[in-house]
Amino acid sequence: MRLTSNTFAGKLFARWGPVKGAKSYEVEICADPPVEENFHSLTPSTSGTYVIEDLASATRQWLRVRGVSKKSVGPWSQLANKVVP
């Protein structure tokens, strides 16, 4: 997964490659990744991109994504992180 930011305060842009068989993707975000309970689910995505808005500027955010098929849920991606502009 790749995270980018532009000059848009409070926004991050996530992009990932397709997962074979995935019909949608679960995306989770947190500011303290060592604690599993800190992750918050975002609205599922059906594409390989996601815009996360209304984030606190100057905070580091961590995201992960996984593919979801009709029969199963895949493993979480490696964590990606970025400081919010």
PLM feature segments, named:
Residues Y50-P75:
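Beta-strand-rich modules
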Residues G10, E26, P34-E36, T59-W62:
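A broad, structure-centric signal for solvent-exposed, well-ordered loop/edge residues
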Residues M1-G21, S57, K71-P85:
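Pro/Thr/Ser/Gly-rich low-complexity, intrinsically disordered linker/stalk tracts
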